[in-house]
């Protein structure tokens, strides 16, 4: 570097000064002497042909130097050069003295020496044919000088513009103090020295004595010199980037003797090469150092003013294969590279193993460093990386070139990070372990061979092939690849506990890939949609959060314009990019995190929440935090039996979690509840929390044209295979669950699309009816804007559920409908849109096995009646249903009798219903005849389907009061419900069809509700224990728009569906076995899951919809009864079951299930439980002993006293309706000690026997 001082650049024109000739003759003669001396000297040293060898490289370099320094007229032939050089050397000037000649000779020798030293610094890639030419050397020297000067100027500009850091915080030392405070850190390591570099001038103010032994030079060599002069030229930029004043930590942070650790160095350290003088081989040898910078102030001895300095602790890095060697098992490092095969990051551990500093490899081609024979392997490796989809895998060893030119053999493991939005590989992660080291253990030795100036054509071609390969989106069968270095366990697979089907994911994957191949647009526009998908996600989320009503208002106009197209949304949806598991999971994690910010920190392990208890919405949490009412601090009472069962995931017929739930996070347990049961699917469906929140799913979902239900009935007969818990099994299970998760989300999406179209259809019909606009609670028939409604592009019609345009039963085509006058004598607040319908055929009572009496009057066709202005309506009386919020349909007998005609038979399971009042008193409708029910049917069904529940008959109140019936019989109150029936997925027909939204207050002051009752907040003073045994005093009525006579072609089905929904919400257990309706589970079983309690609303999670009624706490219900002090805070809406009555009859028939024998189902379940229990893991004796040593409480069995609490902190009212089961009752035997087994005997029989007894 000292040679750089001989060629300082001029401030005015630095590029011309070294090459411009001087006007005087003496400097010109010096230049000629330099060129001649350079030529002759180099020829004598390096060329075997002697001075007369004109074709040597040394003569060529001499000629280049002569052409640089001589003026144009002095450029002559090589022979002339030789004559001039001989004349200048052997014929000195007669006018001068010998002293002048000797000074010229000394100057000439010094120039030759400097030029040779400059040639040593020339990198190998700048050399021509392995030789350093004079021109290339001078150019490189000039560029290096400019770089150093530019760095200094930038440094000064940075210091002047930003100002100095606060002087009060920066410690100040003198040179002597600096030596004392640094000695305690460097005295322990002989390869470590300390140096203080001024941040103002760049000069060395202090350097420790260890440099003399490290560099074998005197300490004075560093005095009054700039530190960058000792660095390798290509490391100067790295040094300046890491020593910016505002990036440096204060020395006081690590000034303590014990606080300075290796971890502290690794966080802030960087690598540079340092050299002082050339070695005995007559070339400069740089040594790599790890440098850790700190910010201090140093006061110079002469000046009183202290200046900011960078204190560097530099430690020399030795080869990992030389003593002290790195152990073979620790010779591991990682790299990342981009899809175009450029190094993106290199682990620091690679420095002693490869000899390269991180800056040497970053942004350089990977293939250049590999052995030529191993380069083709990289194409196969990247193909497997694309197929694995983020899963790490091992591959055959490769040979990697170290800095000294030798190859080391590496065992490699590869993985990748996949962008969840574009589904493309962002970067590839390689984990390498050295198998065979180099023969030359000094990996920092100089490379003896010349480096390639340009990439070999084969490298370039191979790189292009790999880059084109990785432009493809990753197949969806792969996992996320989120984990660092390919660790897929770092993210949470929330689906694993509810899955029981082994083929759902694979079927969905095959179908998805086949559809991608069929869709030409998607195949052609991969790169297009990959760039747009992220923007669509962000845009959709922003739009839905900021202005959802504005989006919804534009939907009717949009759909009106597309009436001529059969399925416009379906066509548009096919072109949208696919929605991946990562997208849904990422957005769900963000949403749950944001919700947890408002959640009160009350998650203590007093009682566990089962996975099927829906998580609180953010509005619930805000209310639970600020509301003084009973909602605050109340959550659903837990079902410990449910969470303690050890049923595995292979049990296809049980809606139970596959493992005991974690208590770390309430939201993580409740985000995916097994409540959505589809017909034909034998596994609990994971409910997606973001069905209503996250806009990414509906927008980017791959809309399949096939039916929504892909799983056949044959899956339940899948044999039980005894599999070990291996890495392959876990990976396959993870992929299967992700695919199943996406499939269920897709089905939910399709269902919501169908519902939104039904909603729009009913809105279009009800336009022009002012009474409907003011009738609250009627979402499906009113013109009220729905805040949850997505835009038109997010919905698609399902062809098999669309009514024909010429249908006389429905106006589903969306055309304009003329307004009809209201019905004569119709009470506007006592009719539900599902209770009145247009019917083209008379109705009859339901056939068996209906458990209660339905008085279904009949009436003639609309054309035969002339008295009323609108067609009359069929109606029926709903019996008393055991729900926590009793609701009874108001009925009106028809005005005219008519002959009976057959209707569609809707088969029902043997659900148990308490018998209800057949009809209302005739006093309400004195002018109309009453049609009695069938007593035979009533008595038969009451005796056949209610063996355990005594019959109760409620006295109706005026008008249509809700009868008070108990949801739990006395026989079931004294014991815990069976653990197999704790699931809230009680109805297989519950297809995520209930959508809740707020209904603004209308002019009538009466808030309308539906037959679907929410399991949440009933009144301000309702306690968890009261709603099981008492009914709310406020009768619930509904307003009916006058146009609903055209809304229901299947009034029998819609009314029954409404009734089923009431029963489904009342029963906490229902049909836990999700195989069929005929499983025969008790409809009104006592359940500690708290379905009848008045907790904060969980139905939004339960049904996968927005519980926006929680958002409007001002919505009250004025009843006019004696109990008018009760206010209804939750305004419920009609489920989509009623809307589905407008669908075609063939569609409705697809939801019928054959009944199954209860005993046969239970017998299968017991056998599966027994098989699964054999597969449960058992502790070995050594494991038991180890656990006893760590956890003393395991010696006695049970749980530690800190968490062994039998109470539930969420149960404030300790009445008989609240059943909180202690932990000891459901703890399975851990097999830890004899005491544990004894305790199990005391508490009862083992789990499987108790299950059999209780079922």
From Swiss-Prot:
Motif Nuclear export signal 2 location, chain numbering: 462-471
Region: CRY binding domain, residue numbers: 1155-1255
Low complexity bias: start-end ranges: 959-972
Biological role: Transcriptional repressor which forms a core component of the circadian clock. The circadian clock, an internal time-keeping system, regulates various physiological processes through the generation of approximately 24 hour circadian rhythms in gene expression, which are translated into rhythms in metabolism and behavior. It is derived from the Latin roots 'circa' (about) and 'diem' (day) and acts as an important regulator of a wide array of physiological functions including metabolism, sleep, body temperature, blood pressure, endocrine, immune, cardiovascular, and renal function.
Chain span(s) of sequence motif LXXLL: 308-312, 1057-1061
GO-annotated biological processes: chromatin remodeling; circadian regulation of gene expression; circadian rhythm; entrainment of circadian clock by photoperiod; fatty acid metabolic process; gluconeogenesis; glycogen biosynthetic process; lactate biosynthetic process
Entry GO MF terms: transcription cis-regulatory region binding; transcription coactivator activity; transcription corepressor binding
Motif Nuclear export signal 3, residue range(s) on this chain: 989-996
PANTHER family the record matches: PERIOD CIRCADIAN PROTEIN (PTHR11269), PERIOD CIRCADIAN PROTEIN HOMOLOG 2 (PTHR11269:SF9)
Compositional bias segments (type: Polar residues): 35-56, 829-838, 936-956, 1090-1106
Stored InterPro entries: PAS, PAS-like_dom_sf, PAS_fold_3, Per1-3_PAS-A, Period_circadian-like_C, Period_circadian_regulator
Region (Important for protein stability): 480-484
Species annotation: Homo sapiens (Human)
The entry's keywords: Acetylation, Biological rhythms, Cytoplasm, Disease variant, Nucleus, Phosphoprotein, Repeat, Transcription, Transcription regulation, Ubl conjugation
UniProt keyword annotation of Secreted present: no
Disordered as annotated region, ranges: 1-79, 473-557, 617-646, 764-838, 931-985, 1018-1050, 1077-1106, 1231-1255
Subunit structure: Homodimer. Component of the circadian core oscillator, which includes the CRY proteins, CLOCK or NPAS2, BMAL1 or BMAL2, CSNK1D and/or CSNK1E, TIMELESS, and the PER proteins. Interacts with CLOCK-BMAL1 (off DNA). Interacts with BMAL2. Interacts directly with PER1 and PER3, and through a C-terminal domain, with CRY1 and CRY2. Interacts (via PAS 2 domain) with TIMELESS. Interacts with NFIL3. Different large complexes have been identified with different repressive functions. The core of PER complexes is composed of at least PER1, PER2, PER3, CRY1, CRY2, CSNK1D and/or CSNK1E.
Region (CSNK1E binding domain): 512-717
Protein name from the UniProt record: Period circadian protein homolog 2
Post-translational modification: Acetylated. Deacetylated by SIRT1, resulting in decreased protein stability. Deacetylated by SIRT6, preventing its degradation by the proteasome, resulting in increased protein stability. Phosphorylated by CSNK1E and CSNK1D. Phosphorylation results in PER2 protein degradation. May be dephosphorylated by PP1.
Biased composition (Basic and acidic residues): 504-516, 529-541
Motif Nuclear localization signal mapped to chain: 789-805
Disease: Advanced sleep phase syndrome, familial, 1: An autosomal dominant disorder characterized by very early sleep onset and offset. Individuals are 'morning larks' with a 4 hours advance of the sleep, temperature and melatonin rhythms.
